[in-house]
Regions:
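Short, mixed-charge, low-aromatic patches
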Residues: 1-7, 30-34, 49-52, 74, ...
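Short, low-complexity N-terminal intrinsically disordered segments enriched in polar/charged residues
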Residues: 1-25, 119-128
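Generic alpha-helical hydrophobic packing signal
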Residues: 3-10, 17-20, 35, 88, ...
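A solvent-exposed, acidic/Ser-Thr-rich amphipathic alpha-helical stretch
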Residues: 16-20, 24-68
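A beta-strand edge to alpha-helix "cap/lid" segment located at domain peripheries
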Residues: 45-128
Length: 128
């Protein structure tokens, strides 16, 4: 459970170095809206972009429950988009942990809210 607490503290702080240390080198991150297994470095790039796009990023934990091989968590990601709009993304995650490192994340989230954040990130970076 401690590694999951550290993981979310690093996410909120935008501490990519700590996130890299917490992930096992061969960890994969899966999202329900694209069904793709991301490798660690690709996920860290997404998280960098999230931090550049959403200010005041925080995770309000609804529940965190130990599982035999990890943790199940429900949370609400909150923050502010570049135009000033508040964002609120409800999600549930399964985080598999082995030897004190995260080896797999399965994240279930509202794809519409995720698309709003992605569009804001792309607009801020000049991509379409």
């Amino acid at each position: 459970m401690e590694v999951v607490v550290r993981f979310f503290a690093a996410l909120e702080a935008g501490d990519i170095g700590t996130l890299r240390e917490i992930y096992a080198p061969d960890a994969v991150i899966w999202h329900n809206d694209d069904l793709v297994e991301q490798p660690v470095e690709e996920n860290l790039n997404v998280l960098r972009g999230l931090h550049r796009t959403v200010s005041g990023l925080r995770y309000d934990i609804v529940r965190r429950v130990p599982a035999p091989d990890g943790v199940l968590q429900q949370h609400v990601l909150r923050g502010r988009l570049p135009g000033g709009a508040e964002v609120e993304l409800h999600a549930a995650m399964y985080l598999r942990v082995r030897d004190g490192r995260i080896t797999r994340i399965e994240e279930y989230l509202d794809s519409g809210k995720r698309a709003t954040i992605k569009a804001a990130r792309e607009a801020a970076s000049g991509k379409r």
